[in-house]
Amino acid sequence: MTDLQWETFSYQAVEGASVLYFLAMLAYFVELAGLRTVARDEEVEDRRTAMAGRLGLVLTSFAAAVHLVALVARGLAADPNRVPWGNMYEFTISGTFVVVLAFLVVTRIWGTEWLGPLVTTFVVAALMAAFLGLDDTVLPLPDALNSYWLVIHVVSAVISTGAFTIGALLSGLYLVKSRSTRETGYLARLTDLAKLDRLSYRMHAFGFPVWTFAVLITGPIWAHQAWGAYWNWDPKEVWAFITWVVYAAYLHARATAGWRGRNAAYLALVGVATLWFNFIGINFFSSASQHSYAEGLGQEHSVVVDVLAPVEATQEVGIVVGSDQPAL
């Protein structure tokens, strides 16, 4: 297949995965609509309601498989072939896949299928935003990104993002359930508060060392290789460190101050807010960041690359690339 055929196939696979996620979301909501609005100990699910929930999980699994195919095809569409992490569109479709994968793994281990409606709604919204608002042109990687550190750094960052996102969903559900005076419908499907709190903690405890590896180890090493300095106080670096501090405070407070329940849940939500602001806000609103890779449809974007000169000074080169024109 040619590069153009791989690119077209990737688009079609993403569209197919989006349709499957949407159908899974509908199945989950059909399950919720079929729940009796009575107390947990009186609630009885009919066969069709249970089948809708199982169908939602099966559709989510199939969607994830198609989603993975789309990512592979996206990488094969580039010349030379590369990992699909060259711009915000590619990061979005990669990140949403990891969120779904984390959901499926957690559901397999701890039976958290009740997260399905939230996860599929989030993924459908994110993929729709990627389709409508981001430039999906396949371009070669800038020199600064063309490194094996891209794989090491981004894999760890994306894995931790998936864990933190699932942890935040669990924390949000904890807060909603803890304020409810009567457990009916969806809330009756949730596990008890103690387990919600414990599952959220486990997701954050898993994600934090991976995020540390991405932000404080591989990131600085890669920055030194690309730009000649381990730390540049770039806006994205600063916000990544802020996110690290928030999650460090979360884990420290739980371990030493005995924070549980609402206080820990609020802090977890602050952490995920800084995480996603770093991904979305910095890319769209900070033109000074060397990490900016966001572009809308038909919009020009700037990639700033520091080229180390043979002399002591560092020369900064700006490359402006339009969505419909080749790189200069």
Label the predicted regions.
Residues 1-328:
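Polytopic transmembrane helical bundles with strong interfacial aromatic enrichment
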